[in-house]
Design a protein with these regions (language model features):
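Catalytic cores of nucleotide-enabled group-transfer and carboxylate-activating enzymes in metabolic
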Residues: 1, 13-17
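A short, well-structured beta->alpha microelement
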Residues: 1-9, 118-137
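Solvent-exposed alpha-helical segments within well-ordered globular domains of core cellular machineries
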Residues: 4-11, 38, 83
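Intrinsically disordered or low-complexity boundary/linker segments at protein termini
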Residues: 16-110, 115-128, 139-143, 149-166
Length: 166
């Protein structure tokens, strides 16, 4: 199937970043992510998987709003996804707002000191149960980026499963 072909290509070419579009549910029994993306999540382990659901052209984005789970700074991929967000914000010349708990915010601020050209701000997200609070601060022109983790990793939270329903 298509997912297996993609996984084989990713592994044989040592691809580190994979960007895929999210599908639109065809019927009520479809999952939010769809079978192919679910297979990609299960079939990859060392890749940065970016699932993108464009609602508007990327050049119309005015601000990135990034929700970061607690302990994300302890994950191997922390520097990688931060670098991707930094690159997007730099290329578009837009600000970034990070929502994270106190410890994760400290780590994010250290990363931002290295990249002083970034226009960043921080808001507290004490608990992932407060995820919906972010929606009150989303403005027209914002793009929401949700950092998640794979099951059985330090920053994984069972509440990630509910994100599609928000």
């Amino acid at each position: 199937n298509i997912a297996n072909c993609i996984i084989n290509t990713v592994q044989s070419n040592k691809i580190t970043d994979l960007i895929v579009g999210i599908h639109h549910k065809a019927n009520i029994v479809d999952t939010f992510l769809g079978g192919m993306i679910t297979s990609l999540i299960n079939g990859t382990s060392n890749q940065n998987l970016i699932i993108y659901g464009p609602k508007k052209p990327i050049n119309s984005v005015k601000r990135l709003v990034v929700a970061v789970p607690q302990m994300a700074e302890l994950e191997v991929g922390f520097d990688v996804w931060f670098d991707r967000i930094k690159n997007i914000a730099s290329q578009l010349s837009i600000p970034v707002v990070f929502y994270a708990n106190k410890n994760t915010t400290i780590a994010l601020k250290k990363q931002c000191e290295i990249h002083s050209s970034l226009n960043v701000s921080f808001r507290e997200l004490a608990s992932w149960e407060d995820f919906l609070i972010i929606s009150k601060h989303i403005k027209h022109g914002d793009t929401l980026i949700v950092i998640t983790a794979r099951k059985a990793t330090l920053s994984y939270n069972n509440l990630f499963e509910k994100i599609p329903y928000y």
